[in-house]
Swiss-Prot record:
Belongs to the tRNA(Ile)-lysidine synthase family. It comes from Streptococcus pneumoniae (strain ATCC 700669 / Spain 23F-1). Pfam families: ATP_bind_3, TilS_C. NCBIfam families: lysidine_TilS_C, lysidine_TilS_N. This is tRNA(Ile)-lysidine synthase.
Length: 425
């Protein structure tokens, strides 16, 4: 194939339509060097600004020389190049994580929105076979995605429909370690695939076909499940066990960097079935939140650096606090004004719950934790509930419960009113 054929494919697919700057992961191998040649030659036609990024893994004697040559190549092409050196104990997984962390740093620094890698169809076959041998979930057998949005960036693999034999033999660096069978992918490439092709000469095409078929099923299920609110457990549990599993797996596709194992997936299923309330980290910065008949999976929110102190309100004063206007002894007008009997003799404290909090009801002291459970108050509301305290005792949990002192005691002690109005934050 000629270079213009690759350009036409890129334009037809519209890979770079949404991007002005793209970072190319440049390893120095044949596939990435040819991708460099195509992208650098046709920057104008593709309407992109190309940035190069290379990781020197420091695993071979030649790697430092290759780094110097890539710097020369970038200078000749008048393109910026960013280079980082891997350190620490080497493994395929650590190296991959290091590379992608570095690429994201480069993208953040340069304002690029696309990361381009030279993965091709042969890589796809190896990946699917590796996942099959490891016993991964069916949806992962669709293989590497041609385009993948991760956070605010898009990973583009424009060579995924081409085999390595489609690339012309141009200047590149040969990684001799690829011939060694120390790593799993190398054993797949050098040993397992050649043996399987003896049984079926079209084995690679067969594997790619299975991957595409699984992808079609995955997309179809996602489309058909659009009308089901999976986060509503009444809806989810109205289906058979098999359908529940498929719907839940499809829901998890929304979080591409979550990647639950089979055991973790089974644990999530069990939590949804057995626990009434639950909030706990699950994996990769995500947490599972369940509140009775609803659940959601979301990124863990960063905590504020400083916690808000409790508010002290004195008699004959007003203050706006966390979406409410509190008026101590000064009447507020309106239909939706809450009124709580209090004493004018001392200040009022407004805060969130603390460990050991109790509320007096019907003459009995009840722990807030038990009260919230009995009233089925969602965890989010428990944490955000405002507590009104006076004389060291809880007078009211705003919108939830009030200290019901006897009428005589109330008349003797509570000689004014705290007026509360809901306002916009």
């Amino acid at each position: 194939m000629r270079e213009p054929d690759f350009l036409n494919h890129f334009l037809k697919k519209g890979y770079f339509k949404k991007h002005a700057k793209a970072v190319l992961a440049l390893s120095g191998g044949l596939d990435s060097m040819f991708l460099f040649k195509v992208l650098s030659t046709y920057q104008k036609e593709l309407e992109i600004e190309l940035i190069l990024a290379h990781v020197n893994h420091k695993q071979r004697i030649e790697s430092d020389w290759e780094e110097k040559e890539l710097r020369k190549l970038a200078a000749e092409a008048e393109l910026p190049i960013y280079i980082s050196n891997f350190s620490g104990e080497f493994s395929e997984a650590r190296a991959r994580n290091f590379r992608y962390d570095f690429f994201q740093e480069v993208m953040k620094k340069t304002g690029a929105t696309a990361l381009v890698t030279a993965h091709h169809a042969d890589d796809q076959v190896e990946t699917i076979l590796m996942r099959l041998i490891r016993g991964t979930r069916l949806r992962y057998l669709s293989g590497i995605k041609e385009k993948q949005v991760v956070g605010e960036i898009e990973i583009i693999r424009p060579f995924l429909h081409f085999q390595k034999k489609d690339f012309p033999s141009i200047f590149h660096f040969e990684d001799t370690s690829n011939q060694e069978n120390h790593y799993f992918r190398n054993r797949i490439r050098n040993s397992y695939l050649p043996e399987l092709e003896k049984e079926n000469p079209r084995f690679r095409d067969a594997i790619l076909g299975i991957g595409n078929e699984i992808l079609d099923y995955d997309l179809a299920i996602a489309e058909l499940s659009n009308n089901t609110n999976v986060e509503n457990l009444q809806q989810l549990f109205s289906y058979s066990e098999s359908t529940q599993r498929v719907l839940l797996q499809t829901y998890l596709n929304r979080f591409p960097d979550l990647n639950l194992t089979k055991a973790q997936f089974a644990e999530v299923q069990q939590i949804l079935k057995s626990k009434s309330q639950y909030r706990h980290p699950i994996k990769n910065g995500y947490e599972l939140i369940k509140e009775y008949q609803q659940f959601q999976i979301c990124k863990i929110s960063p905590q504020a650096d400083e916690e808000e102190d409790e508010l002290v309100l004195h008699y004959q004063n007003q203050v706006a606090y966390q979406g409410y206007l509190f008026s101590f002894g000064l009447p507020l007008e309106g239909e939706l004004i809450q009124q709580i009997p209090v004493s004018r003799e001392t200040s009022i404290h407004i805060r969130h719950r603390k460990t050991g909090d109790v509320l007096i009801q019907n003459g009995h002291r009840k722990k807030l934790r038990r009260l919230f459970i009995d009233l089925k108050i969602p965890m989010e509301k428990r944490n955000s509930a405002l507590i009104i305290e006076q004389f060291g005792e809880i007078v009211s949990i705003l919108g939830i419960a009030t200290n019901n002192l006897s009428k005589k005691t109330k008349n003797d002690i509570m000689n004014t009113v705290l007026y509360i109005e809901k306002i916009d934050r």
